[in-house]
Amino acid sequence: MLQIIRGKLVIFLITLCLFVVYLGFDNNSNSDIVFYGHKTPKSVEIYLSEKNIIYKIINDQKISRGNGHFISIMVNNYRTHCGVVDINLNFFNDILYSVRLKNISKLENMEFCATKQRVYFSDKNKKASYKIINYGDYYDVDYYDNNLKNEVFDWIGKWS
């Protein structure tokens, strides 16, 4: 009888240890892209390269009217608190003004994921706003600085 209890205790302890190791691995693998101090395309590219994150510049155009230009950087299949998503970083006049998490599964808790991720896309002294976009099968979440977003829309309204 004592042998059976001892055997079950050993199995329980091994299972508990494996579970703790799994939780530690799962939390460490949830490393997010953090943009504190990285607000220009060049500094974001350097940051992504240092972290061995594969990215591509998907749009680089200088608008001849006025003094504005847009650059977007895309990071595909990146693990976040919202699951594995694509991330689109949008710059206006070399300042990061918008970050979009794309193709978030309907299975995710959107309020938790959106508020948890918001911290990583804002400056240390202020919080970014966010908007959840429901496409039926999946979600996108936009994070943005209200002042910069208004400046972008004002520029677009003036020159379009």
UniProtKB/Swiss-Prot annotation:
Coiled coil: none annotated. It comes from the Bacteria. This is Uncharacterized protein YdcD. The gene is ydcD.
